[in-house]
Amino acid sequence: MAERSDPLTRGLVALIRGYQVAISPLLPPACRYYPTCSQYTLEAVRRYGAIRGSWLGIRRLCRCHPWHPGGYDPVPDLPGSAPEENGRPSPDGQHSGSGG
């Protein structure tokens, strides 16, 4: 999915990058996930825009606590964002979408 470029998304990306560059290096590592919560939110906002990306980031932050094991947790592909939609066959030859 292409990166969003509306003003709100650009502003959020700038704020997250500012945190990553100016604040995060001063704090001890605390994130239990890979990618880190700030990197996850940055990618989510770039991929899905300010509203949906922020929601994904907030949900991730709520999961990042000492009682959760953490681990690998990439930004999900949301339904309908797969390249094989609209009835075109996927690489394994199966059809998807409403056509077909």
Curated annotation (Swiss-Prot):
Its main location: membrane. Residues 73-100 are annotated as: Disordered. It is found in: Cell inner membrane. Keywords: Cell inner membrane, Cell membrane, Membrane. The keyword RNA-binding does not apply. InterPro entries: Membr_insert_effic_factor_YidD (IPR002696). Transmembrane segments: none annotated. It holds the Pfam family YidD. SMART domains: Haemolytic. The keyword Transcription does not apply. It is a peripheral membrane protein. One of its GO terms (cellular component) is plasma membrane. Could be involved in insertion of integral membrane proteins into the membrane. NCBIfam families: membrane protein insertion efficiency factor YidD. Belongs to the UPF0161 family. This is Putative membrane protein insertion efficiency factor. The lineage of its organism: Bacteria, Bacillati, Cyanobacteriota, Cyanophyceae, Synechococcales.
